[in-house]
């Protein structure tokens, strides 16, 4: 191939990404087969995981689907995993994919109601600390009953709405004008106000993101892995909440206290105030909307509110899978609000489909983790401990692995390994139940450290909002750090101090929960 053609190919490769980034991805593609075939497949597997994390960390340089996808395709091609294993992972996580496709699109059609509610909240509540706590508590409460991805989709829709309103007015347009809020070529924009507003939105989004983890860990419907763990242990909704409470309640209170402290002390880039000019624009927008709201608009808000009630009720009562409820939200809101042309419907799917494709690529990496047994040494090591020490080690081991891998996968692998240990007589049924608590809290809490562990964080990082407010991988890690430390330390202390064991015994003694037998677990292994 002529030199100019090669140059053109290199320029086209990964588009506008920096040259060093393109070279890094190409070098990964060269060294991976060499390590796999000539050094050690286990080492090659861990190298691939680290490379995939690198593509996520560089999400603002290049969307991770392309570089991560190339690594995943090569991994399948050289035999690190198989197409059937990738398909199995996608099948096992079909509900998550349906949730992304339909629920996020459904939330798009409810954004008028969301903007109405949250605009009132932001314009009326002037204390940033109280507002942050409000976002954190609201996200925690919702995530106890809804999936964290759904809650984050709501928060992202609200964030984009606020940003576009400010950007439109600051660019010299009125509220009713069409405007491209992703453009940065408007001279009228006040750089200081814009930067402060970005910081303000970053703060609220991170508080809400951590809130989803704080609430999601408490109930069996809060996170997908909670459902898997509850199914393996044969726990119902109430028993799950009670068994988790010795760890989750102290952690929840500590997390909310952390929210207040970082805001008050302005640590880790928190404490950014809403600029007065931006507050005025949002207040003016609120007044403008109230004045110009027609009967049709009011009916639209009522319809969206009624659909919102159905959404919460349907998810809390598990009337259908999350994705199907999302599809019903799309149908109900569009049918009764008169959105019937294909182009208008298509816009709703733009946000979630790239991330859905990225998640499918992520499942290929999970396939490598399974086929190369990358976590096996850690699990076997953890099982060598006994009693309370074993609970602490499982919490820490789950936490560390959940920072680099999907917490649904980590939780599923661990609960199945512990179930095998119970059935082979290595542990008692009571110890199994305590380990299930350690696994659930270990996968949910420390995983806020990076976007890798929490699908909701990864969705936020790769959303259309992240580049607008300059929310990068590194920034997310730094902003999550105080929460990571507090949630992890409090979680470890509640287990290591014996508080979990003592409270569980108290629940047994007072017949709040009952002892289970190993015979209940003779059914086939769920998940992987």
Curated annotation (Swiss-Prot):
It is found in: Cell inner membrane. It is a multi-pass membrane protein. GO terms for cellular component: plasma membrane. It holds the Pfam family NhaB. The chain crosses the membrane at residues 11-31, 67-87, 98-118, 140-160, 240-260, 311-331, 350-370, 391-411, 449-469, 476-496. It catalyses: 2 Na(+)(in) + 3 H(+)(out) = 2 Na(+)(out) + 3 H(+)(in). One of its GO terms (molecular function) is sodium:proton antiporter activity. Keywords: Antiport, Cell inner membrane, Cell membrane, Ion transport, Membrane, Sodium, Sodium transport, Transmembrane, Transmembrane helix, Transport. InterPro entries: Na+/H+_antiporter_NhaB (IPR004671). Its main location: membrane. Disulfide bonds: none annotated. The keyword Transmembrane applies. Belongs to the NhaB Na(+)/H(+) (TC 2.A.34) antiporter family. Na(+)/H(+) antiporter that extrudes sodium in exchange for external protons. HAMAP family: NhaB. This is Na(+)/H(+) antiporter NhaB.
């Amino acid at each position: 191939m002529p030199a100019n053609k090669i140059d053109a190919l290199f320029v086209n490769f990964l588009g506008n990404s920096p040259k060093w980034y393109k070279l890094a991805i190409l070098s990964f593609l060269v060294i991976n087969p060499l390590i796999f075939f000539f050094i050690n497949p286990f080492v090659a597997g861990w190298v691939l995981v680290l490379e995939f994390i690198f593509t996520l960390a560089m999400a603002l340089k290049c969307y991770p689907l392309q570089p991560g996808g190339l690594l995943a395709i090569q991994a399948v091609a050289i035999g690190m995993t198989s197409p059937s294993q990738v398909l199995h992972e996608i099948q096992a996580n079909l509900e998550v994919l349906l949730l992304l496709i339909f629920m996020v699109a459904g939330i798009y059609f409810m954004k008028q109601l969301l903007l109405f509610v949250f605009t009132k909240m932001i314009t009326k509540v002037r204390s940033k600390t109280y507002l942050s706590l409000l976002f954190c508590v609201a996200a925690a409460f919702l995530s106890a009953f809804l999936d964290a991805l759904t809650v984050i989709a709501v928060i992202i829709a609200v964030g984009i709405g606020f940003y576009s309103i400010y950007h439109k007015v600051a660019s010299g347009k009125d509220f009713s004008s069409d405007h491209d809020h992703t453009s940065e070529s408007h001279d009228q924009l006040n750089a200081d106000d814009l930067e402060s507003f970005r910081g303000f939105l970053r703060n609220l989004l991170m508080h809400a993101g951590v809130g989803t983890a704080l609430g999601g860990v408490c109930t069996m419907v809060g996170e997908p892995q909670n459902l898997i763990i509850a199914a393996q242990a044969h726990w119902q909704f109430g028993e799950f909440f009670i068994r988790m409470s010795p760890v989750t309640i102290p952690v929840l209170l500590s997390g909310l206290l952390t929210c207040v402290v970082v805001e008050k002390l302005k640590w880790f880039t928190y404490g950014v105030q809403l600029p007065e000019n931006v507050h005025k624009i949002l207040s003016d927008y609120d007044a403008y909307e109230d004045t110009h709201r027609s009967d049709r608009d009011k009916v639209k808000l009522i319809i969206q509110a009624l659909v919102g009630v159905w959404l919460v009720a349907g998810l809390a009562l598990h009337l259908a899978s999350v994705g199907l409820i999302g599809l019903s939200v799309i149908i109900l809101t569009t049918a009764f609000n008169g959105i019937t042309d294909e182009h208008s419907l298509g816009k709703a799917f733009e946000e979630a489909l790239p991330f859905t494709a990225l998640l499918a690529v992520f499942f290929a990496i999970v396939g490598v983790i399974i086929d190369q047994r990358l976590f096996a040494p850690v699990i076997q090591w953890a099982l060598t401990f006994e009693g309370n020490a074993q609970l602490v080690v499982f919490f820490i081991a789950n936490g560390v692995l959940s920072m680099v891998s999907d917490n649904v996968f980590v939780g599923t692998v661990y609960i199945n390994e512990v179930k095998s240990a119970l059935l082979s007589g290595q542990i008692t049924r009571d110890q199994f139940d305590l380990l299930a608590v350690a696994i659930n809290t270990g996968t949910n809490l420390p995983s806020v450290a990076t976007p890798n562990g929490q699908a909701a964080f990864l969705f936020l990082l790769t959303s259309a909002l992240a580049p607008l407010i300059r929310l990068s991988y590194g920034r997310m890690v730094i902003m999550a750090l105080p929460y990571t430390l507090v949630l992890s330390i409090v979680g470890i202390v509640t287990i290591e101090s014996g508080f979990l064991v003592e409270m569980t015994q108290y629940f047994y003694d007072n017949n709040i929960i009952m002892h289970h037998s190993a015979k209940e677990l003779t059914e086939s292994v769920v998940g992987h």
